[in-house]
Amino acid sequence: MIDAQEFLGRAVAAETVGAAETVVRESDDDDVDACREAALRLLDAAPRASGALRERLIAKGYADGVVDEVIERLTRVHLLDDRAYAESAVRYCTGRCMGRRGTVMELTRKGVDRALAEAVATEAEQRGDFEDAAWELGRQYARKTRGLDVAVRRRRFWSAGGRKGHSPETLRRVAEELLN
């Protein structure tokens, strides 16, 4: 246990986390180690982009400088790779039949830099991943709506395609082919 004089002599950083909750952390070398351990635990639980990891660590009460130092170190030793995370997330999104716009929104929501999200989405678009996802979505809605009026089938497909972020041109081609 420390005495009052020793406690008052330490530099203390406090940050507001919630509505009225304040987390107090001592600013010393142990803080960097604790932040690194917290970051590794978060990365063990699920892959994350550096932006999302940064938000989580700051919410836990670590200082901006400490968080930036830890993220830079994790990036340098290849434990944190935003590009690999973004590419993996694009595969996940296309597996859910999402389009380019929806995928970019999902990536930025998960803490990926907007420019990187656009670049990875452009690569996927050039490979035809989003086109394939739109066709798969069309096949799903063709099966689900079999027997319904053509106008109803098209409306439901267009609504789903719009929610998932597909371009109108792609949706038009798929609808003309599959939903007549």
Language model features: what each stretch is:
Residues 1-180:
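An alpha-helical, amphipathic repeat domain used for nucleic-acid recognition
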